[in-house]
Amino acid sequence: MPKKSFQRTERISVQIRRDLGAFVQAAVRDHGLPSMSVSDVEVTRDMAHAKVFVTALQAERSFEAVAGLKALARELRMQLAQTMRLRFVPELHFHYDDSLDRGERIDTLLRDLIPPADAEKDESG
């Protein structure tokens, strides 16, 4: 029985991410927020809360983006309630997803560690 509940939370997470993605894009246009996208949604087992992870296209404006979404959380939740067929829509908690920034930083570090192939040929030849 618990496995079924887990599958339901996954389905709801996917639906919230899809619907909220469209609402966030509209909020970006309407309220002048920095460009961002919804990268992931985690819903608690009791479906009372949802962590919404967003990625800002301009990392330096990420705090402004998350603050803007937190201010619009109630309005976004009401929009979700109109589109989703749930008795209770989870309370939305917005967080900045820094996984892209961390991945880029790791990629840069790895690139700095590995010498380019052209430099190796010049030294040996």
Swiss-Prot record:
InterPro entries under this entry? KH_dom-like_a/b, RbfA, RbfA_dom_sf, Ribosome-bd_factorA_CS
Q: Which family does it belong to?
A: Belongs to the RbfA family.
Q: Where in the cell is it found?
A: Cytoplasm
Which source organism does the UniProt entry give?
Answer: Xylella fastidiosa (strain Temecula1 / ATCC 700964)
| Pfam families membership | RBFA (PF02033)
Q: Could you confirm whether the keyword Metal-binding appears in this record?
A: no
Disulfide bridge map: none
Q: What does this protein do?
A: One of several proteins that assist in the late maturation steps of the functional core of the 30S ribosomal subunit. Associates with free 30S ribosomal subunits (but not with 30S subunits that are part of 70S ribosomes or polysomes). Required for efficient processing of 16S rRNA. May interact with the 5'-terminal helix region of 16S rRNA.
Q: What is this protein called?
A: Ribosome-binding factor A
HAMAP family listed in its UniProt record = RbfA (MF_00003)
Checking NCBIfam families in the record gives: rbfA (TIGR00082)
Q: What keyword terms does UniProt attach to this protein?
A: Cytoplasm, Ribosome biogenesis
Q: Is NAD there in the keyword field?
A: no
Q: Which domain of life is it from?
A: Bacteria
Q: Name one GO molecular function term.
A: ribosomal small subunit binding
Give GO cellular component annotations, separated by semicolons.
Answer: cytosol
- Gene Ontology biological process terms in this record: maturation of SSU-rRNA
Q: How does it assemble?
A: Monomer. Binds 30S ribosomal subunits, but not 50S ribosomal subunits or 70S ribosomes.
